[in-house]
Amino acid sequence: MTRLYIQDVTLRDGMHAIRHRLAPAQLRTIAAALDAAGVDAIEVSHGDGLAGSSLTYGPGSNTDWEWITAAADVVTNAKLTTLLLPGIGTIAELEHAHTLGVRSVRVATHATEADIAVQHISRARELGMDVSGFLMMSHMAAPAELARQAKLMEQAGAHCVYVTDSGGRLTMSDVRDRVRAYRDVLDEATQIGIHAHENLSLSVANSVVAVEEGVTRVDASLAGQGAGAGNCPIEAFIAVATLQGWEHGCDLFALQDSADDLVRPLQDRPVQVDRETLTLGYAGVYSSFLRHAERAAIEYGLDTRRILLEVGKRELVGGQEDMIVDVALDLLSSHA
């Protein structure tokens, strides 16, 4: 089979788990360790992508440029990657990231809004970058519709399109159906990627099913560091991939050491499946809403799970973090 492309997201999605607060020196150490461990690509930015630092998403301790520069100083083998959400990050910011050494970008939209990524994907291709389309909250679109959106990204120039389970809501059959739908409509040369979350404890299983269906790009992170219950833990996935006989370039023990020695100590809240993060997956809620919902629950004396269930019922998506307070106030008034 084709060699797997292991995309580490510790230094992007993992930012959600530490409220986007990471010193450049710490980032540099982790990036160097990942590079030495043989991952194919290292994604770096605020958790919500370039220019994500804001009151809505959460301010970062540093700028994207400081973080990217720190990584570029030490990454010599892996492809330095970043994330861009059109409407948050701009083409100008993409171009600046490129001047700092970023050579790959994932352009992310909601599952049904691929059309807003066309200009950004096209410009990234003009810059000579490796480009992936990133269809977030993939559980909110049926397989055929998601595949139609993936085709739009491919037509814009994406080398790869991801099934992106931002809510950690997909089951193995859900992943299988979406990957097959992609394969039915995408050109053979277009790669497919999987981005899993651990909210239902299925991130490794979903990633394995995806690879069995022909996916070659797999997102994962050290100790699963990421939003909600985290991403697919890279050390666990690589162990399984090795047992399966799948080709990759990663050093399992080096990844284990980096996860336990460098990443877990950073966590001010455990990245794990617990009552709150499980509810994210159960309700199909955007994983990065976790910290926002927990903060609102404390402020208004509510159970975080009640907030998350209502958020899921209303089908809120990324960018509507400010609505979480409205949800909390509505819950308070309904039980006054």
UniProtKB/Swiss-Prot annotation:
Keywords, comma-separated and alphabetical: Aromatic hydrocarbons catabolism, Lyase, Manganese, Metal-binding, Plasmid
Keyword Ligase applies: no
Active site (record annotation): H16
UniProt site positions, description: Transition state stabilizer: R12
Reaction it catalyzes: (S)-4-hydroxy-2-oxopentanoate = acetaldehyde + pyruvate
Residues holding Mn(2+): D13, H195, H197
The UniProt record lists the keyword Manganese: yes
SUPFAM superfamilies per the UniProt record, alphabetical: Aldolase, post-HMGL domain-like
Domain (Pyruvate carboxyltransferase): residue spans on this chain: 4-256
Top-rank lineage group of the source organism: Bacteria
Its EC number(s): 4.1.3.39
Residues bound to substrate: R12, D13, S166, H195, Y286
Gene3D superfamilies (alphabetical): 1.10.8.60, Aldolase class I
Family: Belongs to the 4-hydroxy-2-oxovalerate aldolase family.
Matching PANTHER family: 2-ISOPROPYLMALATE SYNTHASE 1, CHLOROPLASTIC-RELATED, HOMOCITRATE SYNTHASE-RELATED
NCBIfam families: 4OH_2_O_val_ald, PRK08195.1
Protein name, as recorded: 4-hydroxy-2-oxovalerate aldolase 7
Species whose genome carries this gene: Rhodococcus jostii (strain RHA1)
